[in-house]
Amino acid sequence: MTRYPDYLSKLIFFLRKLPGIGFKTAEKLAFELISWDSEQLKILGNAFHNVASERSHCPLCFTLKESKEADCHFCREERDNQSLCIVASPKDVFFLERSKVFKGRYHVLGSLLSPITGKHIENERLSILKSRIETLCPKEIILAIDATLEGDATALFLKQELQHFSVNISRLALGLPIGLSFDYVDSGTLARAFSGRHSY
């Protein structure tokens, strides 16, 4: 077993925690990073420090926001209140924004429901979601959730929780591959899934 200096071993260890990064890729990235000059590494280190100290979630929709701001720019700006899109994580919000297929409001669940792993949706996020529906009075709630077993369980749970609201609940159309996360879906496929969404 190759014995690396402690600082390099720790760097490889933490890089491997990133999704999709195995040992060889982590090793390659680590050697790339140690080839950077000290100033570049300090800038990168500051970026990591800022994530730890400044990361903050919007109290309304729970996507990411600037720590100095009261809420996120999605909630501050003029958007279509007739549509509310429910997603699992903040990254889904930014992905949908890049695809330019949605102009309404967002709500981030934080996780998908999974009885097997014990994942659940926080009561606070669910409570605020219901409160926002009462306030915004949207005509449609779009479940933009991965086409996985966890996504299906979450969609069914939300349908049951929100069924007393007089609002149409829809889910993205088939075309999103079963078992695939939004991360791997191109904008064109997502646009078709949005335009072909169906009542759920």
Swiss-Prot record:
Pfam families: RecR_C, RecR_HhH, Toprim_4. Keywords: DNA damage, DNA recombination, DNA repair, Metal-binding, Zinc, Zinc-finger. GO terms for molecular function: DNA binding; zinc ion binding. Belongs to the RecR family. It comes from Chlamydia pneumoniae. Coiled coil: none annotated. SMART domains: TOPRIM. A zinc finger (C4-type) spans 58-75. PANTHER family: RECOMBINATION PROTEIN RECR. Residues 82-177 form the Toprim domain. May play a role in DNA repair. It seems to be involved in an RecBC-independent recombinational process of DNA repair. It may act with RecF and RecO. Transmembrane segments: none annotated. Disulfide bonds: none annotated. This is Recombination protein RecR. The keyword Zinc applies. One of its GO terms (biological process) is DNA recombination.
